[in-house]
């Protein structure tokens, strides 16, 4: 399953731009987004307290989660690292469209995740 995750911080913001960007990204990778999850929530809220937490618990090995920016997952590096770690451990692919990050089961992804982890430790 391929999921596009859209998060805005306030009701006044619209997720349409995020959805368009994810759709274009998916098409460029010859992927079809099967499901969209949209929520209005602060990125400072824990993923457990948002739809994202439910989504992460339901994803299975080889599923793909696409976000426009890593900050859509969380605003804190520690939370981002935890989310990325869960995805890597469970074999869930994670793509960010703007930064161009691709977290999958490759050695490059693991090295990048490790580097993010070091930064989180320093903070």
Stretch-by-stretch model annotation:
Residues 1-123:
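Short, structured surface patches at the beginning of a domain
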């Amino acid at each position: 399953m391929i999921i596009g995750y859209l998060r805005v911080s306030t009701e006044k913001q619209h997720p349409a731009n995020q959805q368009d960007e994810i759709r274009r990204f998916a098409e460029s990778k010859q992927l079809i987004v099967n499901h969209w999850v949209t929520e209005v929530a602060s990125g400072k809220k824990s993923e457990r307290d948002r739809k994202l937490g439910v989504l992460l618990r339901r994803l299975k090995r080889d599923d793909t989660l696409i976000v426009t920016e890593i900050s859509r997952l969380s605003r804190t590096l520690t939370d981002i690292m935890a989310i990325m770690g869960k995805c890597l451990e469970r074999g869930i692919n994670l793509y960010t469209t703007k930064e161009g990050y691709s977290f999958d089961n490759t050695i490059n992804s693991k090295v990048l995740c490790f580097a993010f982890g070091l930064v989180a430790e320093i903070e």
